[in-house]
Amino acid sequence: MRCLPVFVILLLLIASAPGVDAQPKTKYDVPLASRHDFAKKTPKRLSKPRDCCRRNFLCC
């Protein structure tokens, strides 16, 4: 009889826990938009070395 309240509380805790679908993000879960944006920005940086050198002298 003493185990019944403990069993009910455990059932309530298990039912309120998040589902299996909630998975933490890994380093490989990078959105594709950021990769495409980087691919677009790289040629622009290479085509304008003067602007780059004004901001950062190490890129010249």
Swiss-Prot record:
Found, by tissue, as follows:
Expressed by the venom duct.
**Where is this gene product found?**
Secreted
Q: Summarize the PTM comment.
A: Contains 2 disulfide bonds that can be either 'C1-C3, C2-C4' or 'C1-C4, C2-C3', since these disulfide connectivities have been observed for conotoxins with cysteine framework V (for examples, see AC P0DQQ7 and AC P81755).
- Main localization is secreted
What does UniProt give as the signal peptide span?
A: 1-22
| Record GO terms (molecular function) | toxin activity
Entry GO terms, CC? extracellular region
Q: Which UniProt keywords apply?
A: Cleavage on pair of basic residues, Disulfide bond, Secreted, Signal, Toxin
Propeptide residue range(s) = 23-50
Pfam families given in the database record: Chi-conotoxin (PF16981)
- Domain text from the record? The cysteine framework is V (CC-CC).
Give the family from UniProt: Belongs to the conotoxin T superfamily.
Protein's name according to its UniProt entry = Conotoxin VnMRCL-012
